[in-house]
């Protein structure tokens, strides 16, 4: 059980990766497609078990902007896996798909209330794209459930608009960070040169 408690939230991203990778081989290599689906489900089940065993541990992981944003890969993976499940459980898979969408919307709402309503440049990271642009997975999977003209369209445009906005915001953050690092490195070099001159004066005859 201790092993389960050590499972990081990033494992949800790995599950998402396997689910997406399997979809690429759905038509050409069904065996690989199914294997990726099984691995993805197993990884999500592992993190779900961690949540059930120690909810406080999971909530503590989600208490910072990076942890919370990475957790959005969980509902994204659920949406993709629901397409896998449709072949076996039929229309019931649609319930999992809607559950994934609802959970992702919850992530967006929670993240917005914490880090957009109380905006701070220190909390801006590239992982913000996962939260706001990740909902586009609903658009990609919508045709499997005949919702491409409704849910799919809304999810696509929401994600696209967020992508444009975040490209600007995140770029500003990292450009400014790069400038700060350059200034810091120059300051350190200047300080080292000063120390070198001082030492030279001290030990020169």
Q: Where does each model-flagged region fall?
A:
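Juxtamembrane helix-loop boundaries in multi-pass membrane proteins
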Residues: 1-20, 55-80, 97-100, 115-140, ...
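N-terminal signal-anchor module of multipass membrane proteins
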Residues: 1-48, 53
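Structural signature of hydrophobic alpha-helical transmembrane segments
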Residues: 32-45, 90-105, 150-164
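Loop-centered beta-sheet repeat module
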Residues: 132-175
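A cross-family "folded-core" feature that marks the main globular domain of proteins
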Residues: 23-24, 47-54, 107, 111-114, ...
């Amino acid at each position: 059980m201790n092993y389960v408690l050590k499972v990081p939230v990033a494992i949800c991203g790995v599950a998402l990766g396997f689910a997406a990778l399997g979809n690429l081989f759905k038509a050409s290599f069904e065996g690989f497609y199914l294997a990726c689906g099984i691995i993805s489900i197993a990884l999500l089940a592992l993190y779900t078990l961690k949540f059930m065993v120690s909810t406080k541990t999971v909530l503590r992981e989600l208490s910072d902007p990076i942890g919370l944003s990475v957790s959005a890969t969980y509902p994204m993976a659920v949406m993709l896996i629901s397409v896998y499940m449709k072949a076996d459980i039929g229309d019931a898979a649609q319930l999992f798909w809607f559950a994934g969408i609802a959970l992702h919307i919850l992530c967006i709402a929670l993240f917005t209330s914490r880090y957009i309503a109380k905006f701070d440049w220190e909390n801006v990271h590239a992982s913000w794209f996962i939260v706001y642009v990740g909902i586009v997975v609903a658009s990609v999977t919508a045709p499997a459930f005949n919702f491409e003209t409704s849910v799919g369209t809304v999810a696509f445009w929401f994600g696209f608009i967020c992508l444009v906005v975040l490209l600007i915001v995140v770029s500003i953050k990292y450009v400014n960070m790069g400038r700060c690092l350059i200034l810091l490195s120059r300051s350190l070099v200047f300080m080292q040169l000063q120390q070198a001159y001082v030492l030279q004066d001290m030990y020169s005859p």
